[in-house]
Amino acid sequence: KEITSAFRVIDITQNKLSAFVAIQLDMLDLGPVFLDAYIRRCLLEALACGLEDGIVNGTGLNQPIGLIRDIHDGVSYSTTTGYPAKTKIAVTDFTPKTYGGLVAQLAQTERGNMRRVGKIVLLVNPVDYYNKIVPATTVMGSDGLYRADVLPVPTQIIQTTALKSGDAVLFLPDEYKLLAGGRRSGSIEYSDEYKFLEDMRYFKIKQHATGKCFDNTCALYLNIANLEELYVTVKQVEAPTV
């Protein structure tokens, strides 16, 4: 049978993400090795937080297209606000029927074709993880020990500060493409010229990147505000009469 698929052409425009920090030159007296490690750690953390927020919430306007954005064919793109957010799916439990239905949506492309589901990730903020996810995914085994993050379909649960309370994202990480240019951990530069008279040195880190989902069904935007606690249902069965 003739293969009917073809190459897909995607317009990619990378955006610049940068962060900076200023220090007094007198701080070099603390030790250049210590100060260098401290500044690099701060700048790398700032860069990581910026990328994380862009991957989750990015509007596509001078930033990546985030997982929560609606990118279906024909969606209205605003030149001032970018792509709109997806409509949230209310989820009150993680029973096999409910959770299987969510994963089934990921298994179908926007054009209606079937897609193999490999790795699945659930994003939640740290507070919701302990208040909502832990009660809904923790069970006690026959040995008296608790098993956490138990879901009907194997899923990696990742905490992120980029989501608001009550929100969650279920997505296929292999279907989100983050395209970064330049050095993997960003490029760090410094200058003493900006505030020369104040004896201040500025350090800057920058990274060029963009990202988007393959299509609109690679990620689901969930409302877990009313997620219920998991209860193990025990059914009593009468023993047969001998």
How would you label these PLM feature ranges?
Residues K1-Y99:
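Acidic/polar, low-complexity extended loops/arms that serve as protein-protein interfaces
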